[in-house]
């Protein structure tokens, strides 16, 4: 016995057989031990060989267990194990079978052949089960084909298509593939390329998520249904799993050996197998190390000769980066471009998938939800592609609703929390003996009894509603299964069975589903319903909100009424600038009504006026109103961009420069938060070249950063502020009279192409004394909110407010001196008195005017 001539699996089997004998205290390693370990080997050829003959490996193992239990045991330190003479003969015969089959190494199948001819109990067991030499050789030919054992690890080359590929046609037969809607043109083009004589290898290229893999799955469904040209009828479409090919390839050359075995099997199938290679770019460089060939070079000869038909799929970027660089590989594939479907096509795709998702999640999906998914994803999720992002929206919204159905309703949860709270209170009061406590205890018990009754009723209702929804889900799952069976019987030509299902069981089940659905719809309109089982437009909008940060309510038509009140909201914080507020409100309303250009930002405004009149406050208020968050304001101080080279800080450094990987301050802010108000403060201080960046943003709503990525500005509001012309505004008696001077100053300072792209130029008036008086109220409200945190109230008299307005009024500096006046006259003095303990928690501070200062009293 020359162990060097044994394959890895065969030598492992010999060692494991010896270990098994030692473990069981047997003095000899016999054929039973060897057969036992051969049947238990992972990825070995023996279990599939036995199964091919029609014998279960598990039943053989049970019989071997009984045989091993009957063997005599030898214990003690001197006990050693030896190979029995009969097993030695098995090894000799195995070497003989390896020579007969012209194999270079003794493999596990040769050991099994020798065991089947053995003259002991093991041989008798195998022969009694039909595992004889003739049957084994026949099964071996089917599994091994014409492959010979020429390496120490031959198992990786046997049945390689089954090991390293997924059979898409089989999955389509079993209805495990989602229906493919549309894409007929691309599928026809793929079939056209596949039917060529040579270089019949299409490669699907397109953006991620447009449905490249779905096109191949659609082809698999067509092959199964016979809706293909004669040259493709009856073909098998197999998806190559490159990860499985690489995984576990420990030794040098093992990966290449596996891939060659796959190519060889495809070639031997004589055109019956079409290979689908998803993520085609992963072939380039796969398996290459220290001069060995990579996977793409192994495939090239077979692809060029037309012996191997392959369909590739990869994204545009990866095709350019990997495939185009290898011209020899590129010319062997014919490009089939897959464009992103339109919103209308996406809605059709979603309608086709609707039933699959309804069955999976056990909820109903309304048509309005599908339309909302396509429209909202296209409008708001700009960094991904249709239909993938729309399908994900529907899937997640349905998943969220399913979770709500399966978990306890909020109303019931609130009642249970209240009961728990009252029970704690009851235990606490039960320890007291006074009359008031006893009365409170009686009231508590009454309230607890009432709440317990309410909880029981709600629990019963919840279980009832849940049971109805689960019943509907069960019926839908049954219906899908029956439809799969009907398709299968029709394909097999068993028309009696197909007709029985089509005209009997399926209509009967559809009636049951319709009855349950009608009942659920009837109850859905009633008050007090605890569970919903329909995904609607609002659910989709909520998921979009989670993904993007845009407030859900702002996207729904029911909330559009709020935009009619936009002026009031802005005027509450931006005082004395009614014209500017009106212009901004009109621009926002135009956009929300869908009347503005969707390829430009929501609005772009140049605000000019003196300092402290509300230009920046307008931006903050807009961010708060539109996005419910003042932090949605991205502020960029243009005084930092006074040099020519500072443009790269906005959009990111070009390749080869320091900071290339970091991205730009503006582009990164918008990529991370696409829905924001962008404030460019004091733009007149920026270098002229910086304005070239603005042209693209204002006109097309997009900007390309230093890394070549397109950043979308279509959902941003751009506000630029400038102090240009302040001297005219401060001295003017009438704003109309200085309009021409201001326009001239703007033309002198900014290029015409920049001014021409701005939606509106807003001139902010200087603030008068009555405006400052209104701002006093706003500022004092902020002080009162801060005091509330210390449980202190604040009441300020009108005289005190007038006093603050008088000392805080300076037309040259706007509202900022007022803030300083409030800080000096009110906050500083009040802080001292609060710290001295004059105003304990829960008290109210009354502020009035003294002679030349404010006075504070306890209210």
From Swiss-Prot:
Entry note about domains: The Clp repeat (R) domain probably functions as a substrate-discriminating domain, recruiting aggregated proteins to the ClpB hexamer and/or stabilizing bound proteins. The NBD2 domain is responsible for oligomerization, whereas the NBD1 domain stabilizes the hexamer probably in an ATP-dependent manner. The movement of the coiled-coil domain is essential for ClpB ability to rescue proteins from an aggregated state, probably by pulling apart large aggregated proteins, which are bound between the coiled-coils motifs of adjacent ClpB subunits in the functional hexamer.
Pfam families: AAA (PF00004), AAA_2 (PF07724), AAA_lid_9 (PF17871), Clp_N (PF02861), ClpB_D2-small (PF10431)
Region (Repeat 2): 83-146
Entry's localization field: Cytoplasm
Binding partners and assembly: Homohexamer. The oligomerization is ATP-dependent.
Function per UniProt: Part of a stress-induced multi-chaperone system, it is involved in the recovery of the cell from heat-induced damage, in cooperation with DnaK, DnaJ and GrpE. Acts before DnaK, in the processing of protein aggregates. Protein binding stimulates the ATPase activity; ATP hydrolysis unfolds the denatured protein aggregates, which probably helps expose new hydrophobic binding sites on the surface of ClpB-bound aggregates, contributing to the solubilization and refolding of denatured protein aggregates by DnaK.
Top-rank taxon: Bacteria
Coiled-coil region(s): 391-525
Stretches for region Linker: 341-549
Region annotation (NBD2) ranges: 559-766
Record-annotated Clp R domain positions: 3-146
Annotated GO biological process: cellular response to heat; protein refolding
Keywords: ATP-binding, Chaperone, Coiled coil, Cytoplasm, Nucleotide-binding, Repeat, Stress response
Residues given in the record as ATP 1 binding sites: 206-213
GO MF term list: ATP binding; ATP hydrolysis activity
Protein name, entry field: Chaperone protein ClpB
Family label: Belongs to the ClpA/ClpB family.
CC annotations in GO: cytoplasm
Region (Repeat 1): 6-71
Record: residues binding ATP 2: 609-616
Location of the region described as NBD1 in the Swiss-Prot/TrEMBL record: 159-340
Disulfide bonds: none
């Amino acid at each position: 016995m020359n162990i060097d001539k044994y394959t890895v699996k065969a030598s492992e089997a010999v060692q494991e057989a010896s270990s098994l004998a030692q473990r069981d205290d047997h003095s000899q390693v016999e054929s039973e031990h060897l057969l036992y370990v051969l049947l238990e080997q992972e990825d070995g050829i023996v279990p599939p060989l036995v199964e091919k003959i029609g014998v279960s490996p598990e039943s053989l193992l049970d019989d071997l267990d009984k045989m091993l239990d009957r063997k005599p045991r030898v214990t003690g330190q001197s006990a050693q194990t030896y190979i029995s003479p009969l097993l030695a003969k098995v090894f000799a015969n195995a070497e003989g079978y390896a020579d007969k089959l012209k194999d270079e190494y003794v493999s596990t199948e040769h050991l099994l052949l020798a065991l089947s001819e053995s003259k002991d109990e093991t041989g008798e067991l195998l022969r009694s089960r039909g595992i004889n030499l003739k049957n084994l050789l026949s099964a071996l030919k089917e599994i091994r084909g014409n492959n010979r054992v020429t390496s120490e690890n031959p198992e990786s080359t046997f049945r390689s298509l089954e090991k390293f590929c997924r059979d898409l046609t089989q999955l389509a037969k079993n209805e495990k593939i989602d229906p493919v809607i549309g894409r007929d043109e691309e599928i026809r083009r793929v079939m056209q390329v596949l039917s060529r004589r040579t270089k019949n290898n299409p490669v699907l290229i397109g953006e991620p998520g447009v449905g490249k893999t779905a096109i191949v799955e659609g082809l698999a469904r067509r092959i199964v249904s016979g809706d293909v040209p004669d040259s493709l009828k009856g073909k098998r479409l197999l998806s190559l799993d490159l990860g499985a090919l690489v995984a576990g390839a420990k030794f040098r050359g093992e990966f290449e050996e596996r891939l060659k075995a796959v190519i060889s099997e495809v070639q031997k199938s004589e055109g019956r197998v079409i290979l689908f290679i998803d993520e085609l770019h992963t072939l380039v460089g796969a398996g290459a190390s220290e001069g060995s060939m990579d996977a793409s070079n192994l495939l090239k000869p077979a692809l060029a000769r037309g012996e191997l038909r392959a369909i590739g799929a990869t994204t545009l970027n990866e095709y350019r980066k990997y495939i185009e660089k290898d011209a020899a590989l590129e010319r062997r594939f014919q490009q089939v471009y897959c464009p992103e479907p339109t919103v209308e096509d996406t809605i059709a795709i979603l309608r086709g998938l609707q039933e699959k998702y309804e069955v999976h999640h056990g909820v109903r999906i309304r048509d309005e939800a599908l339309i909302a998914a396509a429209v909202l994803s296209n409008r708001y999720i700009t960094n991904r592609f249709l239909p993938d992002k729309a399908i994900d929206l529907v899937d997640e919204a349905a998943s969220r609703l399913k979770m709500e159905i399966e978990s306890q309703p909020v109303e019931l949860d609130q009642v249970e929390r209240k009961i728990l709270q009252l029970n704690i209170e009851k235990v606490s009061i039960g320890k007291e003996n006074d009359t008031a406590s006893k009365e409170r205890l009686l009231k508590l018990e009454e309230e607890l009894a009432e709440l317990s009754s309410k909880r029981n009723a709600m629990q019963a209702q919840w279980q009832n509603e849940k049971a109805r929804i689960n019943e509907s889900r069960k019926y839908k799952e049954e219906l899908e299964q029956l439809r799969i069976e009907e398709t299968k019987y029709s394909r097999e030509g068993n028309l009696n069975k197909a007709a029985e299902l089509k005209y009997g069981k399926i209509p009967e089940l559809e009636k049951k589903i319709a009855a349950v659905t009608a009942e659920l719809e009837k109850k859905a309109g009633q008050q007090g319903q605890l569970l919903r089982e329909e995904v609607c437009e609002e659910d989709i909008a909520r998921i979009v909100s989670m993904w993007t940060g845009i407030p859900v309510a702002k996207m729904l038509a029911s909330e559009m009424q709020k935009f009619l009140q936009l002026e009031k909201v802005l005027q509450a914080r931006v005082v004395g600038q009614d014209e500017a507020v009106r212009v901004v409100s009109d621009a926002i309303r135009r956009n929300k009504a869908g009347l503005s250009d969707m390829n430009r930002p929501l609005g772009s405004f140049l605000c000019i006026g003196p300092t402290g009149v509300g230009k920046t406050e307008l931006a903050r208020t807009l961010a708060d109103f539109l996005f419910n968050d003042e932090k949605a304001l991205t502020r960029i101080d243009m005084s930092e961009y006074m040099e020519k080279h500072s443009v790269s800080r906005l959009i990111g450094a070009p390749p080869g420069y320091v900071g290339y990987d970091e991205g730009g301050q503006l582009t990164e802010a918008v990529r991370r938060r696409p829905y924001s108000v962008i404030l460019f403060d004091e733009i007149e201080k920026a270098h002229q070249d910086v304005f070239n960046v603005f042209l693209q943003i204002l006109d097309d709503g997009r900007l390309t950063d230093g890394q070549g990525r397109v950043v979308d500005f279509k959902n941003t509001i751009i506000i630029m502020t400038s102090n240009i012309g302040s001297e005219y505004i401060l001295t003017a008696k009438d704003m109309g009279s200085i309009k021409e001077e201001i326009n001239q100053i703007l033309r002198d300072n900014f290029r015409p192409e920049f001014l021409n792209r701005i939606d509106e130029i807003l001139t902010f008036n200087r603030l008068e004394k009555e405006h400052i008086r209104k701002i006093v109220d706003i500022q004092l409200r902020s002080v009162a909110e801060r005091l509330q945190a210390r449980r202190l109230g604040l009441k300020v008299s009108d005289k005190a407010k007038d006093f603050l307005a008088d000392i805080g009024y300076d037309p040259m500096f706007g509202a900022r001196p007022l803030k300083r006046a409030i800080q000096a006259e009110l906050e500083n003095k009040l802080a001292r008195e609060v710290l001295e303990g004059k105003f304990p928690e829960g008290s109210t501070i009354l502020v009035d005017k003294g002679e030349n200062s404010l006075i504070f009293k306890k209210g």
